[in-house]
Amino acid sequence: MLGDPPRLTIIAGANGCGKSTFTARSSFVYRIPLLDPDAISKALQPTAPGRSAVAAARKVLNSACQHIEKGEGFAVETTLSGKGYLQMTLDARARGFEVVQVYIGTERVEINLGRIRDRVIAGGHDVPEVDVRRRYLRSFQNLAAGSVAPTT
């Protein structure tokens, strides 16, 4: 609607929780740009997307900054395993964005590991188990930190 603030939608959760499944089935994503590090990584290096993960993450953060500077709404997928998205949220709010966070979680990391195994069998990308386990805990910790971030 006219006059509504731009919206930053953060779709968060640990590796293998179902972020991409959620966005693929969510009609709101078709109306705004979606910054998906996994899709960018695959585009950068189709045969070994894991090798371009850092470059993809950098590209997502740069694109997010551009959208925020222009006042354009967008969505972004993240594991929330780093602190960069907390700062992005603060920057977006400071520029008048409405920030919506959708967190997708599972009861235990083994569910995520099983989903990743299934994804690999289906031709998708793998994530090392040690990374999944580390990010699983960090994701929940950063979710809690982001939940108490100032809203003004």
Labelled PLM ranges:
Residues 97-142:
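A glycine- and Lys/Arg-enriched "phosphate-lid" helix/loop adjacent to the NTP-binding pocket
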Residues 52-104, 136-139:
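Glycine-rich phosphate-binding loop used to anchor ATP phosphates in small-molecule kinases
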Residues 20-72:
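Conserved substrate/cofactor phosphate-moiety recognition/catalytic segment
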Residues 39-41, 81, 105-111:
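Conserved nucleotide-binding/hydrolysis micro-motifs of P-loop NTPases
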Residues 14-15, 20:
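The conserved Walker
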Residues 145-152:
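NTP-dependent small-molecule kinase module
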Residues 1-6, 67-68:
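Phosphate-binding P-loop
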Residues 10-13, 78:
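The Walker A (P-loop) glycine that initiates the GxxxxGKT/S ATP-binding motif of P-loop NTPases
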